[in-house]
């Protein structure tokens, strides 16, 4: 039997992590692995680029509400998730005030997952996956809501640009079997934030993959030939407009 992999992702709006995920999916061999993709919300321009052989799991109501406006949660009756998110915002703000940092406060995402994940149902609970991948922070959901033999958490973040509550977040990273970093620089800043993980052999570097198939599909979405001809063939050069 082929290894069975689950990949957990928020949604597929246009973004760096989303593009990296599509690249990874296109690089995987459907003859060698089976992949289930769980998206918290089935939205985003990148949805159309999911390879046909990937099994996209159906949405689950609680997950689709995780990043919707609080007012929308209240209107739809998701009071517990709304309350958990408000509490997360309060705790995150309290922790941020104590740190005396001038960096943007990114700890709110960790705390939101910390308090909302216990309220969510399991993802495809009848299946125990050979590998579960949490492709974007926060990583509590893949840790707590997926049955898997091994787990990998992905890092896309330059930790010199944000503030996180490293002490509170460390236990989540520590419970993963592996941590995939997209570059040596990302690894460096991550280990500066979580130095105790340096000697654990958890970190593997997996560079983002830009699939030629994906590039061709994006190029075919919209025909801009008319616009190029309108401006004299679309010739460009450095420091000169079309």
Where are these regions (language model features)?
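Active-site proximal beta-strand in glycosyltransferases
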Residues: 131-159
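Short N-terminal targeting/anchoring amphipathic segment
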Residues: 109, 120-137
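Donor nucleotide-sugar binding/catalytic pocket of nucleotide-sugar-dependent glycosyltransferases
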Residues: 152-156, 160, 175-193, 197-218
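Alpha-helix capping/helix-boundary segments
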Residues: 43, 138-139, 185-187
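Conserved donor-binding/catalytic core segment of Leloir-type glycosyltransferases
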Residues: 6, 225-242
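Membrane-proximal helix-turn-helix segments that form the acceptor-binding/catalytic region
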Residues: 117-128, 160-182, 186
